[in-house]
Amino acid sequence: MVFEEFNNFDEAFSALLSKLDFKINEPFNDVKKVLCIEPHPDDCAIGLGGTIKKLTDSGIDVVYLLLTDGSMGTTDGEVSGHELALRRLEEEKRSAEILGVKKIHALDFGDTELPYTREVRKEIVTVIRKERPGIVLMPDPWLPYEGHPDHRHAGFLGIEAVSFAGLPNFNRSDLIAGLDPHSIQAVGFYYTHKPNYFVDISDVMEVKLRAVRTHESQFPEDVWELWEPYLRTIALYYGKMSGHRYAEGIRFVPGIFLHICPFAHVI
């Protein structure tokens, strides 16, 4: 294929996509492991619980990377941050089990205070090199009106970690520890307003809700009375976009388009 022959962007763009190993319409094809980055202990279940359940049921290994301890997620002034963090980690383990997830890496940074630093980026890179996933999922840092800095930082740190995980001179201590560089096919953004891929979760919606509700510290009865319809409405929104009853939306971006790409939004 000689790209000099193309005279317009659409032809060249289509040809470029065909050269990639990653296919947008079959993002999990031939993927054996997925790493799902979450800022707080309930985010993977809330954002992608249905997708995760379907992936694990199909034999794909899903691993969580939890960035903060969740110690701020309460309105109860009688509960200490330390006590809440311990409780939330146990809730996360039970929730993950419902969805078929067997491993959780917890970095234990402070809730609401996830640092946007090289050190956090290095820790994420180390986990990527340990787990060697085919795809990494993370919150979309460009979601309009997202008010939580942990979510924005998690997305940006995840993108940067994916970009650097394949570079041997980045965090060379990993090499000394026997962790080889690892390049990622693509990233997928959940909590996104611009999905380009949908998963029909109509048949596992109740399982997803059960996994979310397992985070009992976050969803007591009075809170769940609002959050259950909220989560159903989000799933119906993605379902409306994709022709399903309930769906989850993900925006996939091939790794090469994460740098100097003016048309990544076109994908």
Curated annotation (Swiss-Prot):
First-listed, main subcellular location of the protein, grouped into a coarse class: cytoplasm
Function text: Deacylates the non-reducing end of diacetylchitobiose (GlcNAc2). Can also use N-acetylglucosamine (GlcNAc) and N-acetylchitotriose (GlcNAc3). Probably involved in chitin degradation.
Family designation: Belongs to the PIGL family.
Lineage, uppermost ranks: Archaea, Methanobacteriati, Methanobacteriota, Thermococci, Thermococcales
Induction: By diacetylchitobiose (GlcNAc2).
SUPFAM superfamilies assigned: LmbE-like
Name under which the protein is recorded: Diacetylchitobiose deacetylase
Gene3D superfamilies per record: LmbE-like
Temperature notes for this entry: Optimum temperature is 75 degrees Celsius. Activity levels at 37 and 100 degrees Celsius are 20% of that observed at the optimal temperature.
Taxonomic superkingdom: Archaea
Localization terms from the record: Cytoplasm
Catalytic activity, EC: 3.5.1.136
Involved pathway(s): Glycan degradation; chitin degradation
GO molecular function, one term: diacetylchitobiose deacetylase activity
InterPro entries noted in UniProt: GlcNAc_PI_deacetylase-related, LmbE-like_dom_sf
Chemical reaction(s) catalysed: N,N'-diacetylchitobiose + H2O = beta-D-glucosaminyl-(1->4)-N-acetyl-D-glucosamine + acetate
Gene it is expressed from: dac
pH relationship of activity: Optimum pH is 8.5.
Keywords: Carbohydrate metabolism, Chitin degradation, Cytoplasm, Hydrolase, Polysaccharide degradation
Source species: Thermococcus kodakarensis (strain ATCC BAA-918 / JCM 12380 / KOD1) (Pyrococcus kodakaraensis (strain KOD1))
GO cellular component annotations of the record: cytoplasm
Subunit description: Homohexamer.
Class of enzymatic activity (EC top level): hydrolase
One record GO biological process: chitin catabolic process
